[in-house]
Amino acid sequence: MSEQRQDIPDPTVLHLLQPDEQLYLKTRAKDAVLAVTDRRLLVADDQRVLLDISYDRLRRVQFDIERSRPATLVIVPESPSDEPQLLAIPPEEYERAARALAVIGERLSES
């Protein structure tokens, strides 16, 4: 389930991790990266962090797949002050996105 940091050389995400934080996986959306760690979810683009929340601050995740379009991943935080994220996931990232959803689901069931 876990991937080592050195296996995923993505500076968009790696510089955000704490020294003892474990990156489980990341998936690329059209305009951003979703990272799933042992502590939190991160959504970042090349310019900034769009969302950085722990699992206990997550309200809902929705994944929709339609014919002839990228999938849509919606991440809704519990607090209205944290902006929901709408990510377009290309077909080549579906497997990673599905693994991310499994980890997120496990974490939500624990909180």
Which functions belong to the PLM regions below?
Residues 1-34:
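Anionic N-terminal interaction surfaces
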Residues 15-19, 92, 99-102, 106:
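Polar/charged alpha-helical tracts
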Residues 19, 25, 75, 88-89:
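Generic detector of low-complexity/intrinsically disordered segments
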Residues 78-100:
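Canonical phosphoinositide-binding patch of PH/PH-like domains
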Residues 23-70, 76:
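Phosphoinositide-binding peripheral membrane targeting modules
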Residues 65, 77-79, 105-108:
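Generic hydrophobic/packing signal
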Residues 2-8, 99-111:
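Short, charged, intrinsically disordered terminal tails
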